[in-house]
């Protein structure tokens, strides 16, 4: 019986190719295991996004941060941060004259613009938007014609002469209010704005002819400013 088993094992060993055949089977099994393990690992890495194409970050608006639109807006925003800008408001305590303030809550001075002698001083050459608004108010129309003027002037470093670059004139009263008639208040706003090529050191002023008629009842009604483009 034992001899028969030994003969059977010997025959099986010869059929399989002996010890070398067993070694080949072991190598094949090990290779198959490694192949399956590698494929499983690769699948997991791809599934969880560890490798492979990365998801694009998005801005709060839902646009990809790498899109041309977002890049353009970002560049424009960064460039605007360094551009000169100024917004000054009228001093409501300066009765009888128009004085500008740069140190109150609604005022803004940035990137080199200065307020000197009631004038804005331009820090760099370039195109600038210049703007200003005034608001006049009266209780009634006087017997003589009433003309209100608002002028923005420039004193250029190249020729040192005061030149009006924006000017407006209005007449709120077309006729005198009769003595027997009830006085009716009138309001007259004047807004001006334009784009100009300015030089470093240029001085800009915004002036009126009748400051006693300025209306300071509400903040933000009388202002003057420049923005580099």
Curated annotation (Swiss-Prot):
Extracellular compartment segments: 52-229
Official protein name in the record: Tumor necrosis factor
- Provide the protein's localization: Cell membrane
Residues carrying a glycan: 76
Job of this protein: Cytokine that binds to TNFRSF1A/TNFR1 and TNFRSF1B/TNFBR. It is mainly secreted by macrophages and can induce cell death of certain tumor cell lines. It is potent pyrogen causing fever by direct action or by stimulation of interleukin-1 secretion and is implicated in the induction of cachexia, Under certain conditions it can stimulate cell proliferation and induce cell differentiation. Induces insulin resistance in adipocytes via inhibition of insulin-induced IRS1 tyrosine phosphorylation and insulin-induced glucose uptake.
Can you summarize the PTM annotation of this record?
The soluble form derives from the membrane form by proteolytic processing. The membrane-bound form is further proteolytically processed by SPPL2A or SPPL2B through regulated intramembrane proteolysis producing TNF intracellular domains (ICD1 and ICD2) released in the cytosol and TNF C-domain 1 and C-domain 2 secreted into the extracellular space.
List GO molecular-function terms, semicolon-separated.
cytokine activity; tumor necrosis factor receptor binding
* CDD domains named among the record's database cross-references: TNF
Recorded GO cellular component terms are:
cell surface; extracellular space; plasma membrane
Query: N6-myristoyl lysine: lipidated where?
Result: 14-15
Q: Any idea which UniProt keywords this protein has? A: Cell membrane, Cytokine, Disulfide bond, Glycoprotein, Lipoprotein, Membrane, Myristate, Secreted, Signal-anchor, Transmembrane, Transmembrane helix
User: Which pairs are disulfide-linked?
Assistant: 141-173
The record ties this protein, via SUPFAM superfamilies, to: TNF-like
Q: Note the subunit structure.
A: Homotrimer. Interacts with SPPL2B.
* Family, as annotated: Belongs to the tumor necrosis factor family.
Report the superkingdom from the record: Eukaryota
Q: Which InterPro entries does its entry note? A: TNF (IPR006053), TNF_alpha (IPR002959), TNF_CS (IPR021184), TNF_dom (IPR006052), Tumour_necrosis_fac-like_dom (IPR008983)
The residue ranges for the Cytoplasmic side of the membrane come to: 1-30
Gene Ontology biological-process annotations? extrinsic apoptotic signaling pathway via death domain receptors; immune response; necroptotic signaling pathway; negative regulation of protein-containing complex disassembly; positive regulation of apoptotic process; positive regulation of canonical NF-kappaB signal transduction; positive regulation of extrinsic apoptotic signaling pathway; positive regulation of JUN kinase activity
Q: Where is this site: Cleavage?
A: 29-30, 34-35, 44-47, 72-73
Q: Where is the THD domain?
A: 84-229
Membrane protein topology class:
Single-pass type II membrane protein
Its transmembrane ranges are: 31-51
């Amino acid at each position: 019986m034992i001899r028969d088993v030994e003969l059977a094992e010997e025959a099986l060993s010869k059929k399989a190719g002996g010890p070398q055949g067993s070694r080949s089977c072991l190598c094949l099994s090990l290779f198959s295991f490694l192949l399956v393990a590698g494929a499983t690992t690769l699948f997991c890495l791809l599934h969880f996004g560890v490798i492979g194409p990365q998801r694009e970050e998005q801005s709060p608006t839902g646009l990809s941060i790498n899109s041309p639109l977002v890049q353009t807006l970002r560049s424009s925003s960064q460039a605007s941060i360094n551009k000169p800008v100024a917004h000054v408001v009228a001093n409501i305590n300066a009765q009888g004259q128009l004085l500008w303030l740069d140190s109150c809550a609604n005022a803004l001075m940035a990137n080199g613009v200065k307020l000197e002698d009631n004038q804005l001083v331009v820090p760099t050459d370039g195109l600038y938007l210049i703007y200003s608004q005034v608001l006049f108010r009266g209780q009634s129309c006087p017997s003589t014609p009433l003309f209100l003027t608002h002028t923005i002037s420039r004193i250029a470093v190249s020729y040192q002469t005061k030149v009006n670059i924006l000017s407006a004139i209005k007449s709120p009263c077309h006729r005198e209010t009769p003595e027997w008639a009830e006085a009716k208040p009138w309001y007259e706003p004047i807004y001006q704005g334009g784009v100009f090529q300015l030089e470093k050191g240029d001085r800009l002023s915004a002036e009126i002819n009748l400051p006693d008629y300025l209306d300071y009842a509400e903040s933000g009604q009388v202002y003057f400013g420049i923005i580099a483009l």
